[in-house]
Amino acid sequence: MADLFSKVNDFQKYRTNLGRQGGLTVKLVGVRSTVVVLVPSTKDHRLRWKLIRLLTLAVYNDSLPDSISIGALLSLLAISFEQPAAVIRGLLSDPDLEVQMIEVSLDDQGEIRFAARGDILTRYKDAYFEKIRDFPNPDDDLAIFEDPELGDYSDITQDEYQAMITTITIQLWILLTKAVTAPDTAHDSEQRRFIKYLQQRKAYAAFKFTTIFTERVRRKIAQSLSIRKFMVSIMLEVRKSGSAKGRISECIADVSAYIEEAGLSGFILTLKYGIGTRFPVLALNAFQSDLSVIRNLIDLYKSMGTIAPFMVLIEDATQVKFAPGNYSLLWSFAMGVGTALDHAMNNLNINRDYLEPSYFRLGQEVVRLSESTVDRSMAQELGIDPTSEDLIMRAVQAAGVGSRDPDAARRTGRFQVADIQIDEGPVDLATEAEDQTTKDNEQRIKVPDPRGSIGQSNAQFQPPKPQLRGRVMPPERKPTDQQKNLQDQRPRPSATPRRLTKDAEDNIDQLFAQYDSGVAAPEDVTLVTSDSTSPARSSGTGSDMDLINQSP
């Protein structure tokens, strides 16, 4: 059996790396798209500022074809360096693009012109500029910078240009952080990071882009794989620079820390919380298969080299192997541990189809029960004796770490998975109320099967009465026999009230007059109604009042 287990591990490792060995038999390249890239011919900051204004218009205009908008974005990413043309030639090795690079300069009037001469390029330049400035809305060219006067500002100094190009570069690279992985929540995180650079005096609010411009640039970055590959190549090249980095390179290296391993949070968090915590529960047989998968993925990640942290951004097909669904049990356990330990896990969406609720709760329970435990290997390495270990346990309990921490309890409660028990029998609300009270609302609520029993139609199904959360509705009260008798004896008006005749009304007036004057009422008063043929005999004590009550 030991040999079989070894062969299974080798086979899984072979499957993980299958197809990555060997060379190409034939070069598979699709039809390339031609893009126009404008680069400055000199280091003049006035030329570069005018070119930046032109390129931002080209990126902002959604009506332009990709050959112009993608080329303008490539130029905008490279213009922050001293030699933009060399950067594009050396780092843009995309098999899907064919770059047509054109150098630009300033003419005698201070306007941009193509450095190369010829009637064809002159006509091409006029058509290029005309397309860029052709906006569906004439006011769109003022919506790039938050300062509307910045678009018409031409007399820029060298110091202002350095502040401007640094701010623009930071904003463009920040857009890459969540352009692919989380575009819906990208705006808030981008604002937080930009505020950080404002506080560090690396960026300046005077050159801040508008929200609509950043949304359009983010959308172009997400749509164009060539743009993302070019940005990843720049980040990898900046890493190789070591400590000899310029201001722009340092800003790119700083932003790249947020971009690395984007889309690989499931794999990284599994290593951190599932394995890095070293809980003894990893010895369960159920975890052994997932642990073997993790071993092979670690080897695969290392074999990919420096491109591995960016595999999701460049859409490498290997990224599918790192999906948490391939090691769902271990990932579910790691998410339970992470939500119980780390406050930052509150913003992580773990509601996935492959989440195993039982192993998720196992991770939370392990954290609760292991709040005072110590890793033996680490304790031996640090030379911790039993006295020090007891001191550590008391300190942990006094600090409220683990289940004693109210924040931890609130975090774990946020991720509770509800269990609903289905029962086909009817529900007795009175009995259920007693169970809820005596067991402190821990009894599961039983509801009947909506489909009904066999042979019973859905129309005959009567749903139970609704229950409020945390308490049970009181049972319906039925009237007692005494209350029913009182209700039956209560006088009810007749369906057809009887009308009094004129003579009866006169007799009633006389009767009230005698009462008011204190004269004794006659013993008998004859009242004749309109719906009776015989007079009604009534005494003057109370029967006549009942008759009055019957009249409208």
Curated annotation (Swiss-Prot):
For the keyword Transmembrane helix, the answer is no
Bias type Basic and acidic residues, positions: 436-449, 474-491
So where does RNA get bound?
Answer: K178, R193, Y258, R352
Chain intervals for the UniProt region annotation (Disordered): 423-552
Database matches in InterPro entries: Paramyx_ncap
Stretches the record annotates as Ntail: 403-552
Keywords noted in UniProt:
Capsid protein, Helical capsid protein, Host cytoplasm, Ribonucleoprotein, RNA-binding, Viral nucleoprotein, Virion
Which GO MF term does the entry hold, naming one? structural molecule activity
Compositionally biased tracts (Polar residues): 527-552
One GO CC term on file:
ribonucleoprotein complex
Localization in the cell: Virion; Host cytoplasm
Assembly with partners or alone: Homomultimer; forms the nucleocapsid. Binds to the viral genomic RNA. N0 interacts with the phosphoprotein (via N-terminus); this interaction allows P to chaperon N0 to avoid N polymerization before encapsidation. Interacts as N-RNA template with the phosphoprotein (via C-terminus); this interaction positions the polymerase on the template.
Domain comment in the entry: Ncore is globular and carries the regions required for self-assembly and RNA-binding. Ntail is an intrinsically disordered monomeric domain in the C-terminus.
Q: Which family does it belong to?
A: Belongs to the paramyxoviruses nucleocapsid family.
Protein known as: Nucleoprotein
Q: What is this protein's gene name?
A: N
